[in-house]
Amino acid sequence: MQASAPVSSKKHKQQEDRVKRDDSLGTSPNIPSAACRTALLQLLQSALWGRAPQEQAFQGLTRADWQSIFLTAQAQTVMALAFQAFEFLPDELLPDDALLTRWMVQTEQAEQHSRHMNDALASLCEFFTTRGLQPVVLKGQSIARLYRHPLARECGDIDLHFSIHGQAAQALCALRDAGVHPQPKPDGSYLYSWQDVPVEHHPRFTDLASPFARRRLSGMLSRFPSQSVALGMGTHAQIMVPEPTVSLFIQSTHILKHAMGWGIGLRQMADLAVSLHSEHSRIDGRSYKRVCSQAHILQWNGLLHGFLTQCLGLPLQQLPYADRLFDSQPLQERVWRDGNFGLLHTTRIASQSSWRSKCRTAVSMLRHARFGWTYAPAETLFTALQLMAGQFSTGALHTDDHNE
């Protein structure tokens, strides 16, 4: 369905202006320059859509600029994806040979890691299916297969959900019988390693904090059943993935959770853009809008869709429904300042204690409360209630995800 041109109501324009004042890009030393941000976005658009980038974005870039672009792409986990755009750039606009070689080597390493991830995923799915179980692969490789260069989509862990009643418990029993011992988390999920790849079993397929919205959406999987698809990427595996409308909802709420917390990165934005581009003809836009309305995230979608069209070049007609798009600047600030799950944030320390991590997560969410109230007030309310109750590790609050 053709989307309307970007427009914002007066009320939300005022709200956006307040968010912009609170989230100034100039307050963090980690933010790349405007020229570097523009160049990286041009590389991503080129890699995503298979077209030449705008050459003027790369004219005049210094060696230091290219180094900043490379490091930012690393932190945003889009380094290998951005590398795919160099085939469209003339030699005189490419980075210097030393950096280009480093970029190429690390891209090859990322692609090799993706191959290992695919082998592990294929093996794990076979382990479960031979026992009569049907794991659904959430995010990650279920989306990587949609990319023009699937192996260039940098991966982290395997996320699974068992939607058939009783199968989640059966899966844990099967793993224990095989000598694998999943570790429980406070939100009801389980973590373990399979062929040196971290795996997480999720009790729910959404990241919604509101219990009322979760109840209203409990029948979503039955209305939109998961489907079997070819994993591809050099494998012969078949995997179960969410139906495209469900996948879209999962991604939108997942990005929202992290945008309200430590931060979100360009890779998750690219995932959503690729999903819409590849499967827009199969997405039930009317049903998707109704589900998002029930979850009270239509305003959030307006901001998110604005980012996809304004920053990643997604065509308006590939949005799931005609949308009132907001200026994406507030979301851009969250992406550029904090990066992929907050990896750019100077106060985030990987080795911090569990208690300290929870406190920092709470502080981070409180820092961005105005952002949440502007675009997803219901989710922000229930997130705040959980914080007040001290449940820092619930499904909606837990932000120490692996890199998916």
Predicted regions and their residues:
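Conserved NTP-donor binding/palm subdomain of two-metal-ion nucleotidyltransferases/polymerases, i.e.
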Residues: 2, 7-16, 20-156, 162-404
